[in-house]
Amino acid sequence: MTTISIGEPTVRMTQEERSEKSRQQILDAALKLFSHKGYGATSVRDIAEEAGLSKGNVYHHFPDKETIFRGLLDRYFQAMSQPDFPFNRALAEGSFPENLEGIGNAVREIVRDYREYVALIYVDVVEFDGTHVRKFYGDMAERFNSFMKAHGMEKELEGKLAAGLSPVSAVMLATRIFYNYFTVEILFGVKDHFGKDTDAAVREISRILRHGMLKPNA
């Protein structure tokens, strides 16, 4: 008598699901290789081997290596546009510039969790002269402006800033300073490069951004 074991039903992936899974495997493998070896030193064969797929499978999903590279940057930029992206959440939930520490900590989370994607930006600058990231940075002020208007931040911030200062410039400046700080700390591996621990540095940077570095007038 044959015994039939009845367990969990087998879940079969559709062709579309299998194809998408392979595509993501390729992108994940390329991210690891591009961010550590660079673009030029990584071949399509390297990506296929890292992904556990054939070279033909890679070409089935992507016509060439540069398309994979662009796909990774697009993946990162798409994540940055989501409401739950740490920076967007911190900016929307707080009141600028009172929430500068929160923004700094959000940027720390981003550079830590998206470290390999941040590295790709440097790869693009070195190996492509910034071709793939130029438009993203060129459109940055417009994106900040749209975000702040959508969340009703612009008018409120105008009332807090010194005369003639742009709310968009103020938020962008603070953001870029924190990105620079955490890129050096996390991506370059230079701990406490302001001569103090990270939390203390975030507090001091926030204080300088809010109040300036000079003593108030007597």
Model regions: which residues?
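Hydrophobic/aromatic-rich alpha-helical bundle segments in the mid-to-C-terminal region
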Residues: 118, 134, 138, 153-207, ...
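N-terminal intrinsically disordered/low-complexity leader segments
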Residues: 1-21, 88, 217-218
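Short, basic, alpha-helical segments at the C-terminal edge of helix-turn-helix-like DNA-binding modules
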Residues: 74-80
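Short coil/turn segments at alpha/beta junctions that flank glycine-rich nucleotide-binding fingerprints
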Residues: 36-40, 114, 158-159
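Short secondary-structure transition hinges
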Residues: 92, 98, 108-149, 194-195
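Hydrophobic alpha-helical connector segments
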Residues: 85-116, 121, 167-174, 202, ...
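Helix-turn-helix
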Residues: 14, 21, 25, 29-67, ...
